[in-house]
Amino acid sequence: NKIDLPASEIDRTKKQIESNKIKLDSKIQLIKPLSFSDYCSLQKDSFVVLSDSGTIFEESSILNFRALNLRESHERPEAVEETTVVISGLKKERILQGIEILQNQFTGLKRNINIVNDYNVKNVSFKVERLIASYIDYVNRVVWQKEF
């Protein structure tokens, strides 16, 4: 039973692998960083996503894919309350336990985990436009120190 494990080949990771002479398992495929849309597609098409990213909570909740966060702490209590992601830390037995739990999660259009209400906002582009327009002069004056 073959499981592919694509991992983003960012410079920092590549340097760590090389400097520590780490031999990767043949199932781990280092890939060039993806565009955001390609990255989201990869996540949606995966059986489970293992990540240490802080945004995995929003992505998993909105796109409804199985996700395991490898951190031990996080800044997204609202997502943990809805159980959109299982938090495992780095211990092998906790990671395997998390993957086993995630097998029961529906994905795609069928849901058994609620989307986090804070992430299910209507009229986002309308609101962003109004916020930007409201702060243009303030940002130009305070941040960029432009005179009018």
What is each of the regions a protein language model found here?
Residues 1-148:
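Nucleotide-activated sugar donor-binding and catalytic core shared by glycosyltransferases
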